[in-house]
Amino acid sequence: MKNKQKVVVVGGGFAGLELIRKLGNSKIYDVVLVDVNNYNFFPPLIYQVSTGFMEPSAISYPFRRILRDKKSVRFRLGSLEKVVPSENKIILSNGELHYDILVMATGAESNFFGNKNIEKYSLPMKTISDALSLRNTILTRLDRATRLQKAEDRKRLLTFVIAGAGPTGVELSGILAEMSSSILKKDYPELDREDLGGIYLIDGQKAVLSAMSTKSQKYTHKKLEQYGVKIKLDTFVKDFDNEKVLLSDDTEIFTKNLIWAAGVSAKTFEGFHKESYGKGNRLKTNEYNLVEGYTNIYALGDCALVLGDEAFPNGHPQLAQPAIQQAENLAKNLERKDDNWKNFAYKDKGSLAIIGRNKAVLDIPGQNYSVKGFLAWLIWIFVHIMGLVNFKNRMRAFVDWIGYYIHRDQYFRMIIKPKEREV
C-alpha cells in the first residue's frame, strides 16, 4: 500500500469513469477522481431532459455511489484551475493535489467561435444544468405566450432556431416537432397552431448528420421536413441579439430562442505548454495518450488529440466510443510493464441518430450499410439504455420512454428554479 503510485484523474465523463472502473481495485495505484460535479451523467440524453421527456436522475448518478466497491479510488469535488507539472501537482478551486500520474479527461465545452452575443444570449446544451435551464426557458416562454395579445409577440417566443445539424441538433429538432404536434394543443388550448413560429435547423455543412452516410442524411432530411422542421444548410448563424437570429446569407429569423449545438472545443488550463495544444484546444498526445512534452501526464476523450493512430491522422471524433476505448487501453497499459505497452487504435462501432418516434438511422462501419426506421430506432433505444451507468438508471429511462410511447405525453414539464444560497 505504501508503495502505490498516485493517479489523479480530472473529469468523470466517459473516459474518466471508464479509467477508474478499470483501475478501481488496482494493487499498484491509488486513484483520485476530481470533478466539478458530484455526479456522472449521460450526455447523449440531455436533450430529452431539456424537453421534459426524462428526469435528470434517469441519466445521472452520484460518483460516491459508483465508487463504493472501488477500494483504490477516492472522489474529490472541485474545479481544476491550474496544472503545475514541475511540482507534480494541480491547483483546484478548493485546494491542491499531488500526483505521480495525471490523467486529463476534462471533456469539451460549447464553442461559440468568439461571438460574445451568441455566448451571452444563446441556450447551450452540454450539461444537465444547461438542459434544466433550457427546459425552464421553453416552458416559461410557452406559458408567457398564452398571455400575450399580439400574434407576432407569441410567434417570437415560440420560434426555435437550432444551430448545428449533428446528432444533437437533429434529435432536438425532431423532439420539439413532436411536442408541437402532439402535446402543445392538449396543454395550451390558449394557443393556436399559427402561434407556433416554427423550428429551424441551421448548419454550415451541405447535409444534416454530415459525419454519417448519404443514405442516412437523405432519410433524416426527409423525415425532419415531414415533421415541419425548416432546414437551412450551407449556412451558419452569424449573430444573435436575443430578439433575432442573423444568418450568413443575411436572412433574419425573429426569435428569442437560439439553441446552440454547433460545435465544441476542449477546455484549456494554465500550466500546459502552448505547444501541447492542437486543433480545437485538444492536448496533443502520442499513440499511448501521453501528452506531448510530458512524461507522466495523459489525456483521454474529447480533450485528447491522439496523433499516433494512422487511421485517424487528424484525431478521433469527439464521441463516447473513442473516449471509452482510449481509457480501456490506458488502464491496461498502466498495469503492464513499461516495455509492453500497446498503441491505441480506435475501432469504429457505428453511428446512430434518432429523429423521432419509430424513426432513427444507423450506419454500420466497414459494411457501407445503413439501417433506418423502426429497427434503427429499437437499436438506438437499446444502445442508449445499456450506455447508462447502472441498472437503476436503465430502468428509469425505459419506464420514461414506455410511458411516452404509450401516452404520447411528457411527464416532466415542471419549471424548477433552484434558489441561490451560499454554501
Residue spans of the language-model regions?
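C-terminal, flexible cofactor-proximal segment of oxidoreductases
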Residues: 322, 326-423
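Short hydrophobic core segments
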Residues: 8-10, 97-107, 237, 245, ...
